[in-house]
């Protein structure tokens, strides 16, 4: 838990303390509840898992399916409106902003044939997904990729790719270093040195 909270302090310039993260950050609560719900889902206690997941959704405004696989240090910043689908896989140190959907693209017309099929995206380590982005289908967003705000991504994203637009297009290569809100250290020091 300590490493998880520290990883958020490292990525969010507004975060002031670990206690404030625990008490006031909905993303922290959603990840905590997901760990419990996922435990029950893995143990085949699906109803208990779904009840915990629904409680978390009502408390946080963040919907994470209990069977989604989430790595270490997922940071959901602001969080309201985030949806993470059942077959989503999220790597370590991923950052997701508000109103993001990791969803499927197939309508649920023939649910029986879709139950054991990968329908949702996989995000590898150190991916950042901007607010309002829709990452849809059984695609892979590779390590260190950045998805811009409101982008609609329906195809695989290369490592260090920068995806923007509708439909999303790769417009460059991302730095491997995480910079909150894209602010460099020089810009931060210039703006706040008074």
Language-model segments: residues:
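Terminal amphipathic alpha-helical/low-complexity segments used for targeting or macromolecular assembly
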Residues: 1-60, 176-194
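Conserved short-loop catalytic and cofactor-binding motifs
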Residues: 20, 24, 58, 82, ...
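Extended, non-globular alpha-helical segments
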Residues: 48, 52, 95, 101, ...
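Short gly/ser/thr-rich secondary-structure transition/capping motifs
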Residues: 54-64, 108-113
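Left-handed beta-helix
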Residues: 60, 65-66, 71-72, 77-86, ...
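Conserved catalytic-core motifs of eukaryotic protein kinase domains, centered on the activation segment
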Residues: 106-107, 139, 174-175
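C-terminal segments of enzyme domains that contribute to small-molecule binding surfaces
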Residues: 113-136, 166-194
